Curated annotation (Swiss-Prot):
This protein's record includes keyword Transferase: yes
Key words of the record: ATP-binding, Cytoplasm, Kinase, Nucleotide-binding, Transferase
Pfam families: Acetate_kinase
Name of this chain's protein: Probable butyrate kinase
Organism of origin: Bacillus cytotoxicus (strain DSM 22905 / CIP 110041 / 391-98 / NVH 391-98)
A single GO BP: acetate metabolic process
Cysteine pairings via disulfide bonds: none
UniProt superkingdom: Bacteria
Chain's gene name: buk
Amino acid sequence: MSVNRILVINPGSTSTKIGVFDNERPVLEETIRHDTGEIKKYKRIIDQYEFRKETILEILHSHGINISKLSAVCGRGGLLRPIEGGTYTVNEAMLEDLKNGYSGHHASNLGGILAYEIASGLNIPAFIVDPVVVDEMEPIARISGIAGMERKSIFHALNQKAVARKVAAEIGHKYEDLNLIIAHMGGGITVGAHKNGKVIDVNNGLNGEGPFSPERAGTVPVGQLIEMCFSGNYYRDEMMKKIVGQGGLVSLIGTNDAIKVENMVEKGDPEATLIYKAMAYQVAKEIGGASAVLHGKIDAIVLTGGLAYSKILINEIKERVNWIADVIVHPGEDELQALAEGALRVLREEEAPKEYVVREKETVARG
């Protein structure tokens, strides 16, 4: 079997994780931590790409990695327009949307840009895989009770899809032939209904929908939320932080450290026990809803993400949902591996690369 050497890049706000893979085998994995003073020199996140590129190349050189031997470069997908899942070739339309922050400005936008900048000099392809904007929801799932306010698909697409493929292989099937419910449980929690390789419904784990998590509020009573918004006591940014960043366990018990909360539970703390069980309860409830989406025809329920290491949480969820289908636990997440595997499927011609296409923009005549 021929060896494809792939460089993968996963940019974060103050670090860049890189990996070099020979097919599925990791040759190098490293987290580059950037000096905050250096980061602050740049007004826009997107302006950091040259600095990060040079740092990546220096690290590769220091480890004796000959970049001329690379077959492809794959970056984490950023905040693009809604697209279906898969591996995409980085093209000009994608670069423009990443640089302009079409759906928002985030460090992940640098992934495709860095991949392209390094790959173009080597005349090899640059890819992204399953960004958070993956949207395969069915029309019926988009409807909310307010006209003009559609439900959005924003979830842990990269890890959910990667784990779904692993589980499919473990049980001897193709991902595209299965119905799965995948619950990714980390700083945010998303539960996706996977039908024949498409995530046809999923909670928006970023903007206040679904189970609460270590630092996100999830679904909350809307009437009370509106009253709080217009109480005159909070600015908009403060309210957004209550939803994302300072919600969930942070709001309820004062920490986003699930290990700390679990230790409190083991010591018999009644408040911590109730709150931790409530988080498991809400995850189980979301899984139950996803089972209805799939008409009760589910091949497996999969629990993944960092919180899947918690035996207390897993057992609480299992007790409530194991009547629906077998529960498989895949703790943690490996985004570098998932990116490498996405690129590898294309290099091996197991699937075709997808093209990022922007529909022609409407023009407005001005007198």
